[in-house]
């Protein structure tokens, strides 16, 4: 079974692979990366940032454009999406991966915000998810739209939170679906860990 955003998915949206070395101290040339200044301005001595620092970093960078800056819960989701070592932080390489994904999702959001209201409606969300390779039944899309909308509209921050959660849960599911059949068996603890860490 091909998963959205992964090689062989057809219609996947995420650029590149999901691999990436964990962050850490800078390496030669890293300080020349234009993103490093944003990252280094909030990172501690360990070269890692947590959700609070990520929120400050993304706000300073202006990646949200004219949209409201990301709230802390969305930043927690972003960290958890790339937190492969379960440290609650991300290094510079993970930050760069996040930056690329966020830029792609922002462009995607803009392309589906046809009336330029700064929001997407549930029908636009369904089209967006379909073009990202998610094949979800209408009831699932309806549940997602209800979870992330306010008065029937989904803001940029909520759209990003939705994309982050879908990617993280899909990645978690894919790791457990070794036969790629679209079905897995979870122990209760494994299931709780999967959904509570996203």
From Swiss-Prot:
Ca(2+) 2 binds at residues 113, 115, 117, 119, 124. Keywords: Calcium, Cytoplasm, Membrane, Metal-binding, Phosphoprotein, Repeat, Sarcoplasmic reticulum. It is found in: Cytoplasm; Sarcoplasmic reticulum membrane. One of its GO terms (cellular component) is sarcoplasmic reticulum membrane. Phosphorylated; partially. It is a peripheral membrane protein. SMART domains: EFh. Ca(2+) 1 binds at residues 83, 85, 87, 89, 94. This is Sorcin. Its main location: cytoplasm. GO terms for molecular function: calcium ion binding. Homodimer. Interacts with GCA and RYR2. Interacts with ANXA7. This protein is encoded by an amplified gene in multidrug-resistant cells. Residues 29-64, 70-103, 100-135, 134-169 form the EF-hand domain. Detected in myocardium. Changing residue 99 to G: No significant effect. The modification Phosphoserine is found at residue 178. Disulfide bonds: none annotated. CDD domains: EFh_PEF_sorcin (cd16187). InterPro entries: EF-hand-dom_pair (IPR011992), EF_Hand_1_Ca_BS (IPR018247), EF_hand_dom (IPR002048). Gene3D superfamilies: 6.10.140.900, EF-hand. Changing residue 124 to A: Strongly reduced modulation of RYR2 channel activity. Calcium-binding protein that modulates excitation-contraction coupling in the heart. Contributes to calcium homeostasis in the sarcoplasmic reticulum in the heart. Modulates the activity of RYR2 calcium channels. It comes from the Eukaryota.
């Amino acid at each position: 079974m091909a998963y959205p955003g992964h090689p062989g998915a057809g219609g996947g949206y995420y650029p590149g692979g999901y691999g990436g070395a964990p962050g850490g101290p800078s390496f030669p040339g890293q300080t020349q990366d234009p993103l490093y200044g944003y990252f280094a301005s909030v990172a501690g001595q360990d070269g890692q940032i947590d959700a609070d620092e990520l929120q400050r970093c993304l706000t300073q960078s202006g990646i949200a454009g004219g949209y409201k800056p990301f709230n802390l819960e969305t930043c927690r989701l972003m960290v958890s999406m790339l937190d492969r070592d379960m440290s609650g932080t991300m290094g510079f390489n993970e930050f760069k991966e996040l930056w690329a994904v966020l830029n792609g999702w922002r462009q995607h959001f803009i392309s589906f915000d046809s009336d330029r209201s700064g929001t997407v409606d549930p029908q636009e969300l369904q089209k967006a998810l379909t073009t990202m390779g998610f094949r979800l039944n209408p009831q699932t899309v309806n549940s997602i739209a209800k979870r992330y909308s306010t008065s029937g509209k989904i803001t940029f921050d909520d759209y990003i939170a939705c994309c982050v959660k879908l990617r993280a849960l899909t990645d978690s599911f894919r790791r457990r679906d070794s036969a790629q059949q679209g079905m897995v068996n979870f122990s209760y603890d494994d299931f709780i860990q999967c959904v509570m860490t996203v």
